[in-house]
Amino acid sequence: MSVRPERNIFYDKVELGLTLTRPADTVQYADNDTIAASTSTAYAIEVANVGAVPGQNVNVVGAYCSSTNPAATPVSLSVWLFNSPPASPVDNAAFAITDGENDTVVGVIPISTWVKSSNNSRGQAHTMKLPLKCAAADTSLYALIVANNAYQPISGEVFKFKFHIERT
């Protein structure tokens, strides 16, 4: 008779969100432009408490975004996640990170499938399990949002992101 050890893996599951409100303008985005909250002040968006402890491994198992814009051509965007805060381009500037910042990228989540209503739209990343790791002394990740298509925003457009995280 052989005995095999039983292996149980338990995950601490959390849902984390962030909100980004665009500037009060309607300047069109080009492919690879940064979507940000300011045209003059650059900063990455902190996604706090991704890890329960510093340096924790996590899996992103779902990513969703809603927008207050019901555009005929919805935005296709990517959420770039870093384990240390990168310098950020301002809104509508070309997305450009340094080689050093590229070394701190822990994942990129494309959100390109959108549905719309007459008042808003919603996108999601499909079937994913993206393993990430927080920095050794941090429980947060830092996000930059990048347009992947030419996109006509509305003034003060609000993007709300939700991330489903499994802490391992």
Residue map of PLM features:
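Surface-exposed, low-hydrophobicity beta-strand/loop segments enriched in small/polar/acidic residues
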Residues: 2-168
